[in-house]
A protein has these predicted regions:
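Short S/T/G/P-rich N-terminal loop/turn motif that feeds into the first structured element of a domain
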Residues: 1-52, 59-70, 79-110
Length: 110
């Protein structure tokens, strides 16, 4: 099974940027850095400070799925953000199908 990667986008709730950075991003990045199956983990923010995006790449769909249990940051996102988009790419198989119910778009290579 090959690598899986995604981008997840959201709008920052008014007044919540610093709380988001303090209560999610720091711990999220530490969790990802310790996981040998997380190949890429990068949070970015637009210049206006109102939209964020995380890029992640994993060794497999199985390990991507494990992030939802292993990374407590996923449970906190709704406290600070309004999700707007998710794009899933790579060898995702069926393991990540539950993300479709949450609006994820599954992309294929051209």
């Amino acid at each position: 099974m090959g690598q899986v990667y995604w981008s997840w986008e959201a709008e920052v709730k008014p007044g919540e940027l610093e709380n988001f950075k303090d209560n999610v991003v720091r711990d999220w990045n530490e969790t990802a850095a310790k996981d040998c199956n997380t190949l890429i983990n990068q949070w970015v923010i637009d210049e206006g400070g109102s939209s964020v995006k995380v890029y992640q790449r994993f060794t497999s769909a199985k390990h991507a799925l494990a992030q939802f249990a292993d990374n407590p940051g996923w449970e906190k996102l709704d406290d600070y953000l309004e999700p707007s988009a998710m794009f899933v790419c790579g060898d995702y198989g069926n393991e990540l199908d539950f993300l479709r119910e949450h609006g994820a778009v599954f992309m294929q290579d051209l």
